[in-house]
Amino acid sequence: MTASLLLHSRWIDPVMFLYDNGLDDMSKNMEGFVGGNFAANQCRNLIAHPSTLAPSTTYTSSEVPVSGMGEPVKQCSPCSAVQNTPSASLPYGYFGGSYYPCRMPKSCTQPTTYGEKYMDTSVSGEEFPSRAKEFAFYQGYSSGPYQPVPSYLDVPVVPALSAPSEPRHESLLPVETYQPWAITNGWSSPVYCPKDQTQSSTLWKSSIQDTVSGTDGASVRRGRKKRVPYTKVQLKELEREYATNKFITKDKRRRISAHTNLTERQVTIWFQNRRVKEKKVVNKYKGIS
C-alpha cells in the first residue's frame, strides 16, 4: 500500500489518494457494508486517507507539481449514496485506485492529521490566494510522466556567490604598491592600486639605492653619481669653444670630448648650463638698469 500527495493542475487544494492492490476485493464488499445502496465506483470525489499512514510520510512543497493557481475552484455535488444514506459513516481505506480532484463535503470525509490541517472544506473560494501563500506552493513544472521538479524558489540562485574560494598562497613582493585587500568574496590575491603611484615611487627609488659591495669590498651607491668638478684645462677648452659658438655641433662635440677626456653627454650638458648661466646674468643686469 503506497500513499502520495498530488495536486491537480486546475485546483489548488492538495488531495490525498490511496492506491490499493486489493481494490476489487474492497469493491465487492462495499455494497454489503453500506446496506446495499452504495457502490464503490459512484463516489469519485471522496478522499481516501488511511489512518495507518505513518506520520513521518510527509511531502514538501517542492515534490508537488502545481499549475493554474489562480483558477476558480469547482464544487462537486455530494455523493448520491451519501445523500440517500446520511447516517452511513464510511471509514478510510475503502476507496482508491485514482485521485479525486473535487472538493468534498464533510459528510464524505473524516479528515485526520493531514486532512484536518489542509483540507478545510468550509473555506470559501475567495480565500484561496491567501491559502496558496500559506502552503508555500510555487509555480513549477506541470504534472506528467516526468519526475516533479522543484520550483525556482526551492533552488539557490547562485550558490557559489557566498562560498569562499580556495585560498591561493602567493608570495607578495616587498613593494608598498602591492597591498592585499580584504575582499568579502574570498579573494586572497594582491590587488594593485595605481592611485598611490606618486607617493610610493619615491620609496621604490630609495630602495634601489642600496649599497652593494664592489669587487674591492668598498661600498658603492647605485644611485646618482657623485659630482666631479672639471679641471682648469677642461674648463679653458670649453670656454674657448663657447666663445666661438654658443651652440655646439656633433663634430665639434666629438672633438672636444676627445681633447678633454669628457663624454659627449658631459660636453652637451655643460653647454646647456653655460647658456642658462649667461641668460641669468643678462637678466640680472637688465633688472638693475
Swiss-Prot record:
Under the heading InterPro entries, the entry gives: AP_axis_regulatory_Homeobox (IPR051003), HD (IPR001356), Homeobox_CS (IPR017970), Homeodomain-like_sf (IPR009057), HoxA13_N (IPR022067)
One GO molecular-function entry: DNA-binding transcription factor activity, RNA polymerase II-specific
Q: Name one Pfam family in it.
A: HoxA13_N
Coiled-coil spans are none
Single GO BP term: regulation of transcription by RNA polymerase II
Tell me which species this is from: Danio rerio (Zebrafish)
The entry's cellular-component GO terms read:
nucleus
Protein known as: Homeobox protein Hox-A13b
Q: What does this chain do?
A: Sequence-specific transcription factor which is part of a developmental regulatory system that provides cells with specific positional identities on the anterior-posterior axis.
What the entry lists under PROSITE patterns is as follows: HOMEOBOX_1, HOMEOBOX_2
Superkingdom of this protein's organism: Eukaryota
Q: Which residues form the DNA-binding region?
A: 223-282
Keyword field:
Developmental protein, DNA-binding, Homeobox, Nucleus, Transcription, Transcription regulation
Q: Which PANTHER family match?
A: HOMEOBOX PROTEIN HOX-A13A-RELATED (PTHR45804:SF9), SEGMENTATION PROTEIN FUSHI TARAZU-LIKE PROTEIN (PTHR45804)
**In which compartments does the protein localize?**
Nucleus
| Family label | Belongs to the Abd-B homeobox family.
